[in-house]
């Protein structure tokens, strides 16, 4: 049951524009930076951030796609043969000595981000890993903090944050739902 819309299309657009500016400022430009979106919605957010960064800086930043299914400690498994579901990683550039900015839709327990960091480290040794999220809802189980946050949305554990993006869902909005 949906309780409230906490970000509409305009709020998401403004948050991503602000995050793009913060990424550029904190990294003193975009030289050596790469964006890696965490499947599924993190990929679309990473692409949108790359577009905004290019509009601001006049230079493109590479975007990769990361599937962290095999790195999760709470794997999603198929019921028939108990094989982990793998969707595929596509990071077509080296990450070694690069500033890797992981992009995800919601930061909750930190487990997805930990798995994403493991996956990135398997690809090489980045100079630094930063984290950009559209929504930080709290309730961390691991010592992980986002470097760039679109909106902090305090929630109870009985609530869900639902991020809908036009590329997948036909609408841009973030809402809170009861479990």
UniProtKB/Swiss-Prot annotation:
It is an enzyme of class 2 (transferase). The lineage of its organism: Bacteria, Bacillati, Bacillota, Bacilli, Bacillales. Homodimer and homohexamer; in equilibrium. The keyword Metal-binding does not apply. Belongs to the purine/pyrimidine phosphoribosyltransferase family. PyrR subfamily. A motif (PRPP-binding) lies at residues 100-112. Keywords: Glycosyltransferase, RNA-binding, Transcription, Transcription regulation, Transcription termination, Transferase. It catalyses: UMP + diphosphate = 5-phospho-alpha-D-ribose 1-diphosphate + uracil. The keyword Glycosyltransferase applies. GO terms for molecular function: RNA binding; uracil phosphoribosyltransferase activity. SUPFAM superfamilies: PRTase-like. This is Bifunctional protein PyrR. It comes from Bacillus caldolyticus. Regulates transcriptional attenuation of the pyrimidine nucleotide (pyr) operon by binding in a uridine-dependent manner to specific sites on pyr mRNA. This disrupts an antiterminator hairpin in the RNA and favors formation of a downstream transcription terminator, leading to a reduced expression of downstream genes. InterPro entries: PRibTrfase_dom (IPR000836), PRTase-like (IPR029057), PyrR (IPR023050), PyrR_bifunctional (IPR050137). Substrate binds at residues 40-41, 104-112, 137. Its EC number is 2.4.2.9.
């Amino acid at each position: 049951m949906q309780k409230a819309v906490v970000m509409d299309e305009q709020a998401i657009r403004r948050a991503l524009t602000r995050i793009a500016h913060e990424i550029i400022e904190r990294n003193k430009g975009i030289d050596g930076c790469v964006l890696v979106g965490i499947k599924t919605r993190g990929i679309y957010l990473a692409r949108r951030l790359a577009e905004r960064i290019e509009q601001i800086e006049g230079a493109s930043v590479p975007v990769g796609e990361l599937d962290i299914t095999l790195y999760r400690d709470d794997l999603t498994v198929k019921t028939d043969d108990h094989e982990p579901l793998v969707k595929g990683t596509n990071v077509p550039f080296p990450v070694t000595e690069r500033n890797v900015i992981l992009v995800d839709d919601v930061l909750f327990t930190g487990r997805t981000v930990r798995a994403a960091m493991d996956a990135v480290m398997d690809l090489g040794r980045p100079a630094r890993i930063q984290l950009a999220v559209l929504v930080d809802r709290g309730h961390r189980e691991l010592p992980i903090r986002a470097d760039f946050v679109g909106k902090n949305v305090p929630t109870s554990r009985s609530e869900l944050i639902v991020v809908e993006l036009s590329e997948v869902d036909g609408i841009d909005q973030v809402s809170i739902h009861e479990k």
